[in-house]
């Protein structure tokens, strides 16, 4: 298979595939006599794993570690599960942070009259000071 075939099958761009190869995240493909990359089912599996791991929140390094585990016949599912649960905990912390930000913004929005006045509790709160206008 050539890179355009692999791109169609995996849903990745040719540029992304080359990037993953450059970063050493996938097994290097063989080169044909004319220098073109030749991909196998193994490459499809690795690239699909990378794409899907990225989609569920694993960063590049973590995704590469999953590919390494995928390629390790001595891997233990406990290692994969541990990494997955660590990612879930990280996502839960991020959700808590986002919920806190949302709550703060809603409280600020509720305190703001939203009228033609220059007085704005949102700006005052975010700037850390009170805005006083000369009368």
Curated annotation (Swiss-Prot):
GO molecular function, one term: DNA-binding transcription factor activity
A Gene Ontology cellular-component term: cytoplasm
Transmembrane residue ranges: none
Keywords annotated in UniProt: Activator, Copper, Cytoplasm, DNA-binding, Metal-binding, Transcription, Transcription regulation
DNA-binding found in the keyword field: yes
Location of the DNA-binding region in this protein: 4-23
Domain called HTH merR-type: residue spans: 1-69
Complex formation: Homodimer.
PANTHER family linked: HTH-TYPE TRANSCRIPTIONAL REGULATOR CUER (PTHR30204:SF16), REDOX-CYCLING DRUG-SENSING TRANSCRIPTIONAL ACTIVATOR SOXR (PTHR30204)
Name of the molecule in the record: HTH-type transcriptional regulator CueR
